[in-house]
Amino acid sequence: MRIKGKTAKYLQKLIDEGQPIHFSLIDPDKVKDIQSLSKVASSLFKAGTSAFLIGGTLGVSKEKLDSILSVLQDFSVPKIIFPSNINLISEKADAILFMSLLNSDDLYYVIGAQVSASIIVKTIGLEPIPTGYLIVGHGGTAAHIGRARVVPYDNPELAVAYALAAEYMGMEYLYLEAGSGAPDTVRPEMVKFVSKYSEINLIVGGGIRTPERAVELVKAGAKALVTGNVIETDIERAIKIIEAMQRVYRIE
């Protein structure tokens, strides 16, 4: 049996307490000014973000990744790599979402990249968090790069089938991804349906722009939400999303 690491235990504790997890996604491609990143990260940390995800769909240099992780070391929440490929790995992070793109037609994204990365992850002592990655609806760049057969927004039954498969293969999380900057999020109805039939912990990301939609997704059964674009375009709204998620926890 695999023993959970420090980051996985931290996340599981939040879930066990009924507290929604908020991941702040930092895309190294879009960070132009390290000093500005420090201010943004400080605002997110003070608002109560649970962890930082670091990653992007397109290529990122190791040097840029390490410089961002160095800035984030000032904040006492986990720094978790959200990998687009095996180059996005660093010993400066606390953990990595060790993901399989479940609905890809390309075996590289299902298992090939994972085989290539596994020895590196082991060697540098990076904590892996087993995660199924499922692209839904719009999909965006992630769907194009990953050659995914996207799950339609209105087909929750198909999402359940993937969720059960991920659960039965021992994955701890299923990340339902609508795509960066998607015109709509994964629908709350899909989240609720998947939560009804599968016990896997659901992460939902893509297109989350308002506190109201964030609350809907949490109440539907999402254990964690990821916001990225809204952090880049409207930090005050991102903070309101975090605060709204915390109110759900306090009220319930």
Swiss-Prot record:
Functional pathway: Membrane lipid metabolism; glycerophospholipid metabolism
Origin: domain of life: Archaea
Reaction(s) catalysed (UniProt annotation): sn-glycerol 1-phosphate + (2E,6E,10E)-geranylgeranyl diphosphate = sn-3-O-(geranylgeranyl)glycerol 1-phosphate + diphosphate
Binding site for Mg(2+): D27, T57
Cellular localisation: Cytoplasm
GO cellular component terms attached to this protein's record: cytoplasm
Record-level Gene Ontology MF annotations: magnesium ion binding; phosphoglycerol geranylgeranyltransferase activity
BP GO annotations: glycerophospholipid biosynthetic process
Matching InterPro entries: GGGP/HepGP_synthase_I (IPR039074), GGGP/HepGP_synthase_sf (IPR038597), GGGP_HepGP_synthase (IPR008205), GGGP_synth (IPR010946)
CDD domains, per database record: PcrB_like
Keyword match Zinc-finger: no
Annotated residues for binding of sn-glycerol 1-phosphate: Y175, L176, E177, A178, G179, S180, G181, G206, G207, G228, N229
Keywords carried by this UniProt record: Cytoplasm, Lipid biosynthesis, Lipid metabolism, Magnesium, Metal-binding, Phospholipid biosynthesis, Phospholipid metabolism, Transferase
Cofactor: Mg(2+)
Primary enzyme class: transferase
Enzyme Commission numbers on file: 2.5.1.41
Known function: Prenyltransferase that catalyzes the transfer of the geranylgeranyl moiety of geranylgeranyl diphosphate (GGPP) to the C3 hydroxyl of sn-glycerol-1-phosphate (G1P). This reaction is the first ether-bond-formation step in the biosynthesis of archaeal membrane lipids.
Family stated for the protein in its record: Belongs to the GGGP/HepGP synthase family. Group II subfamily.
Listed name of the protein: Geranylgeranylglyceryl phosphate synthase
Organism: Metallosphaera sedula (strain ATCC 51363 / DSM 5348 / JCM 9185 / NBRC 15509 / TH2)
